């Protein structure tokens, strides 16, 4: 699964996920992309599950790019622990997603195959997505 190799600080504040994606909002590497239209978080497990769904559907054809990286640690306290006594330990990593962000890209497969692969992948993600293709002249 994806996670940072090293971090300067183990824990991070919660923060607020606002605005729309100004970077990573167009198909850059492949011919087709999966664009999020919702705001939220994608965990490393969800990204990996979606990647596997795409890989299994396109079999050996095509090349896949993952355009998001889970670099934000989410901490949790153990079950049945009383409030207080500091912040919990980092349990997993998430990628903050704004509307318009491209999550996956693919090249080397027909459009219908890419569409179906992304449909299967979007079922693994908690956000609404849409299928996009590269603009002419890009």
Curated annotation (Swiss-Prot):
Binds 23S rRNA and is also seen to make contacts with the A and possibly P site tRNAs. GO terms for molecular function: rRNA binding; structural constituent of ribosome; tRNA binding. GO terms for cellular component: cytosolic large ribosomal subunit. SUPFAM superfamilies: Ribosomal protein L16p/L10e (SSF54686). Residues 1-13 have a biased composition (Basic residues). InterPro entries: Ribosomal_uL16 (IPR047873), Ribosomal_uL16_bact-type (IPR000114), Ribosomal_uL16_CS (IPR020798), Ribosomal_uL16_dom (IPR016180), Ribosomal_uL16_sf (IPR036920). This is Large ribosomal subunit protein uL16. Part of the 50S ribosomal subunit. It comes from the Bacteria. Keywords: Ribonucleoprotein, Ribosomal protein, RNA-binding, rRNA-binding, tRNA-binding. Belongs to the universal ribosomal protein uL16 family. GO terms for biological process: translation. Residues 1-22 are annotated as: Disordered. HAMAP family: Ribosomal_uL16. Pfam families: Ribosomal_L16 (PF00252).
